[in-house]
UniProtKB/Swiss-Prot annotation:
The keyword Membrane does not apply. This is Toxin Bcg III 21.00. It is found in: Secreted; Nematocyst. Keywords: Ion channel impairing toxin, Nematocyst, Potassium channel impairing toxin, Secreted, Toxin, Voltage-gated potassium channel impairing toxin. The lineage of its organism: Eukaryota, Metazoa, Cnidaria, Anthozoa, Hexacorallia.
Length: 27
């Protein structure tokens, strides 16, 4: 089950709802 909590500011949510590093340093 996906818990709807905020990701860290530099993370993004992937298609599975996981917080993934790092939205400012990749594609």
């Amino acid at each position: 089950n996906i818990v709807d909590v905020p990701c860290r500011d530099d993370y993004y949510r992937d298609s599975d709802g996981n917080c993934v590093c790092c939205k400012f340093g990749g594609a």
